[in-house]
Amino acid sequence: MLKLTTTSVTFHVLRYFQLGLSVTNLLLASFAIITNYKVDRILRLSLAVSIISSVYFGIVRFLPVLLIFVMEIVQTVLWFTAFVTLASKFGSMSCSSMPRGINFDYSGSCKIAKIDILPEAVLFILFLATTYASYITVLSQAKENGSSTRSVLKACVKALRDTVDRLETSLEESEPLLDLEVQEDARTETESIEDSTDSEDNANIEQEKVIDGSIEHSS
């Protein structure tokens, strides 16, 4: 009984850590995107995974044990992907050399993204632990119901395939929206660059006029 209580408490502690880090990652990814003038798919991936995890924690108590195990596997894969992609892009990047402007701050976004790498790595490890715990729970319930381990694994694989298919369908539907956002942000950035270039040209023209006027007056 003591062992069961200790295991339950440990599992709930892991859940609280996962929830806290997911919310932290959600805030960091949001700030990184806000301070980044352009659309960054890697930062958006981190934000999307954080939202998925937050929703998952809200409904996990209503899910059956087998579906929880499948969702734990999916969460582990998602956090591993988010962690690896974020670390590969921002891990070795020098943030101090990146430009800053009135409407954008690449340097600040880079620094926030670097900080965000650690929570994502920890979340990946925590989900590995809860995935294993969920697997043990599924096996114990299967033994109580007289089911074999093989049948349980087959059911898990089928549920996992269905979940992956649904995620792929959702991602395919969201790609056109992301492409439109990328085009819009690229257009806005181009217009800002053109405006700044026109301002510089006008300033140079005014300066040349002043110089020409000074020369004529001297003559």
Curated annotation (Swiss-Prot):
Residue ranges, Cytoplasmic side: 1-15, 63, 138-219
Bilayer topology: Multi-pass membrane protein
A GO CC annotation given for this chain: fungal-type vacuole
Protein keywords: Membrane, Transmembrane, Transmembrane helix, Vacuole
Subcellular localization, as worded in the UniProt entry: Vacuole membrane
The organism's place on the tree of life at top rank: Eukaryota
Biased composition (Acidic residues): 191-203
S-S pairs: none
TM annotation in the entry: 16-36, 42-62, 64-84, 117-137
Major site of localization recorded for this protein: membrane
Chain intervals for the UniProt region annotation (Disordered): 176-219
Stretches with biased composition (Basic and acidic residues): 206-219
Segments on the Vacuolar side according to the record's topology features: 37-41, 85-116
Note: Present with 339 molecules/cell in log phase SD medium.
Designated name of the protein: Uncharacterized vacuolar membrane protein YNR061C
The species this protein was found in: Saccharomyces cerevisiae (strain ATCC 204508 / S288c)
